């Protein structure tokens, strides 16, 4: 639940409206996030970079990805976003 709230918050901070319902199924979250990232990479690259900055996805991890296939790249970036957002929620709850 807090993970979804964090994702929605960071996307809205980046002016990329997204509103995942709190009750979203994990597979559906992954699929919708993948689609959103794919569209950002393809059509709104500057906004995509801004989103990565706001979420604070490590730049070195992004640079390690192979960008030759946008579908695979978007899936890998979506995973990094989920991982970073989960870390934020975990740290906030732990400390």
Locate predicted features.
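Charged, compositionally biased N-terminal leader segments and the immediate start
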Residues: 1-26
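Charged, alpha-helix-enriched surfaces in structured cytosolic catalytic cores
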Residues: 2, 24, 28, 32, ...
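Hydrophobic alpha-helical segments at protein termini of multi-pass membrane proteins
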Residues: 3, 8, 47-50, 68, ...
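A short, ordered amphipathic alpha-helix with a cationic face
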Residues: 4-6, 23-24, 35-40, 49-53
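Conserved, well-folded catalytic cores of nucleic-acid-processing
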Residues: 10-14, 36, 40, 84
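Feature detects long, helix-prone N-terminal segments enriched in hydrophobes
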Residues: 32-36, 80
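Amphipathic protein-protein interaction modules
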Residues: 40-75
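Amphipathic alpha-helical binding modules
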Residues: 68-95
């Amino acid at each position: 639940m807090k993970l979804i709230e964090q994702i929605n918050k960071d996307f809205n901070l980046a002016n990329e409206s997204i509103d995942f319902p709190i009750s979203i199924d994990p597979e559906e979250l992954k699929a919708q996030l993948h689609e959103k990232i794919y569209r950002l990479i393809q059509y709104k690259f500057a906004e995509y970079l801004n989103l990565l900055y706001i979420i604070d996805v490590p730049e070195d991890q992004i640079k390690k990805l192979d960008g030759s296939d946008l579908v695979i790249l978007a899936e890998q970036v979506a995973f990094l976003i989920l991982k970073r957002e989960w870390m934020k929620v975990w740290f906030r709850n732990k400390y």
